[in-house]
Amino acid sequence: MCKKPYYITTPIYYPSTNLHIGNTYTTVAADAIARFKRLTGHEVMFLTGTDEHGQKIERIANEKGITPKEHVDEIVAGIKDLWKMMNISYDKFIRTTDDYHVKAVQEIFKKLYDQGDIYKDSYEGLYCTPCESFWTETQLVNGNCPDCGRPVEKAKEEAYFFKMSKYADRLIQYIEEHPDFIQPESRKNEMLNNFLRPGLQDLCVSRTSFTWGIPVSFDEKHVIYVWIDALSNYITALGYGQENQELYKKFWPADVHLIGKDILRFHTIYWPIMLMALGLELPKQVFGHGWLLVDGGKMSKSKGNVVDPVVLVNMFGADAVRYYLLREIPFGSDGLFNNEIFIKKVNTDLANDLGNLLSRTIAMVYKYFDGVIQAPTCKEAIDDELINLALSTPGKVEASIDALKIPEALESIWTLISRANKYIDETTPWILAKDEEKKERLGTVLYNLLETLRFVSVMISPFLTETSVKINDQLNTKVITWESLKEFNGTVAGDKVVKGDVIFPRIDVEEKLAELEALKPAPVKPANEELVKNPIKEEITIDDFDKIDLRVVKVLECEPVKKAKKLLKLKVDLGGEERQVISGIAQYYKPEELVGKYVVLVANLKPVKLRGELSQGMILAAAPSDDSELVLVNPGEMLTGSQVR
């Protein structure tokens, strides 16, 4: 049977330093989807890799006294070790220093130049080295890069430019005609309204101020800039521009580019326009997931809150980390990573729910039948609910994954696990065992539990890769295909189960929290000068209100919260750091009235979820006791991040 091809990619990561839990989140999510597609009969190409050129790499290498290639080789080795530790099943790992990629990128650049889409000019602007981005004065936030908040440098140099504006209208039309191209929906509106419709400037696509990059083949004092170099990896990895293009013909266009929302603009504007210019098909979908927030904000060395996935895996195991990232983080929205919540989730979902179901079932089969699986010959009506739920769950899981709703898929599986635990309490095998005449019924109950565990094991295999194998070993089952879940009879009567170790031992929460706290990196000086002068205080509760830290913020976006008449969702700029705030001011202000306003934020209030949305602070307002009106505190157009005293 011919398998349907499926092509999924992660971003290629920038190896300036070791990766953190946020990068791991993207790759684990892509791995889970890739594994699921293989399980359900697809021929999968799962691509990841590293974006290894640029001025920042060159500077870091010079500071270390080594070559840029030596530096990236060292970091890439660590990245591959991390992916091995996380059980990432990529099919290809591309490095932009690979010879085949270098040659293909040079050919792409020349083709675009020869057809008039790239031209030479000179450029003078403000450049952010960490982001490798040029900005105009009006785009800066407090004089700093609007993406990362770091200082920019003036740069003037001869450069090649790509005629982005030539394809802008065509791209707008394409996005409007292909509603699934950019997901989630809110990201699509952001790209259209904030970047495309206001008008695109031509894009600088070469540099002469550094040498660590792919040289322009016909003008070697220029190196090809990150956009054409890095973004082209998605097709060069398949053989585009090379003699053997079988993989390209089979897998392109990509089914999904899975990326963080911070690089969405590059993947939904620059990349599709490049493809249009090359006469190639666009990827079917670009999915921009949210950020992984820690301590109420983005991970940052300046805050000392960067989470090292290696530490977590060494302490708790890869499957525990994978489960938390895939189940607890709302895919497509920002999510909170918290050590305490993580450990408690492992204890409740993995140790209590799944682990206890397996250990209790195996123990009872051994206790009552010496480990031998009995045939289900004595069924009762109470069995039907469990069996029907087991048979319907694979379809729910598949629908969720097709819609890239990974937490929903796991929720469906855990609903089945919970039902199986309840089934034990309902059927009371320990009581059945006391009556010799009910041995046949006891054997049927235990068969149903073993078969349910087989269903669970198959369904969790893309997500909890090691745990699935451990369960299969104890069940002693070889029937682990997705097709086998169409019938509730894959467990073989007469086989013998195998006693094994507890798959998820319970964790001492306080002990492990103390260990993790001791391993936290020390904060380094933040880049934002306003926050250096007035650092944000520690998290507070309402009872500690006298410690409150008030900051000036600018409202960037505002929209109603679904099914909540009083709530608005605001995206605000806190001196280079973006936050989401849920505020009960909908009856007093329309969303469009707030965009561009400067308001005051309670900046160190502990993040909470309101109606399922993360709120990272509280907007300050004044109102009479009868709430007849409400007025936001207006700080004037002070610098964002300024402290209100």
Listing of model-derived features with the role each one plays in the protein:
Residues 124, 138-142:
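Short metal-coordination and nucleic-acid-contact micro-motifs, chiefly zinc-binding Cys/His arrays
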Residues 135, 152:
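Cys/His-rich microdomains that often coordinate metals
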Residues 1-48, 100-104, 130, 148, ...:
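Structured secondary-structure scaffolds
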Residues 120, 328, 333, 341-379, ...:
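Helix-rich, typically C-terminal accessory recognition domains appended to large enzymatic cores
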Residues 524-645:
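Phosphate-backbone binding interfaces of nucleic-acid-interacting proteins
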